[in-house]
């Protein structure tokens, strides 16, 4: 059977190709080897906390099949890092990422290469603009070639919509969350200089066939700038424009986002040190200037334009709790390290 994959961008992968690449799973064999106790029920319970309203049946299915998913990816040539960690915004150590420094691009490139080996055709810069059923078991898909500005129609017995993100669709996202106005950039286009392809095309295509949109307000908000220096929790702090902490940095992404949106200018600084294991995107952020290196607290305070004494007090207070593994004023109890190097 002939299989064809289309992508409206010049490269495959969409936002997934830009992600750090953490994959959550439940697998007794993998987790027990590192002393981690987990279960499908706990996965579902954690999803209720981190995801808000969820399709519990779907989440349970994902959890039950997640170990098999990792196995399948490995059969396709994907290699994983050996350590299982608690990811940013997560509730339990159940994540791995691709081996090396490519993040989720490793998944995308490896699977794309495998698809080519299997004879699957890929058409880039090709947008799906219409999807209709014309017989009981046949569909018509109208495609727009972005290079030639022409349209054509193909027929198929099945169409898989592996898409649906709409973070770059300002009108649509504001319909469900009015706070996400033009000032809130997407992780794929934080500076507003490039095209972000997550405009919800797949949602509209599915709607043409009678699909119902659900859980649309559950838009994930991630702190782009320095907030993703690390892929795991416990080794960084967030401070406001006065050098003071304002949130438990190990809580859910939704709670962190709510706290950031209450700050003047919706901005914060993220601080870690030389001991932490940086994420795969840090090099690009240093080059872009969104992450800066400091040799001392005083130098860091000057760069942030905050009083050095305030920043020193913040770090001293954090390090005290980190050393004692004690709860702080924000309820934080998870610490991977002190921040002092």
Residue ranges and their predicted role:
Residues 147-150, 154-223:
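Glycine-rich loop(s) and the adjacent beta-strand/alpha-helix scaffold that form part
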Residues 195, 199, 203-205, 209-310:
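An anion/pyrophosphate-binding glycine-rich loop and adjacent beta-alpha core
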Residues 7, 134, 227-231:
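Short loop/turn motifs at secondary-structure junctions and domain boundaries
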Residues 2, 8-121, 125-130, 134, ...:
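Conserved N-terminal/central alpha/beta ligand/cofactor-binding core
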Residues 130, 310-341:
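A glycine-rich dinucleotide-binding beta-alpha-beta segment and adjacent secondary-structure elements
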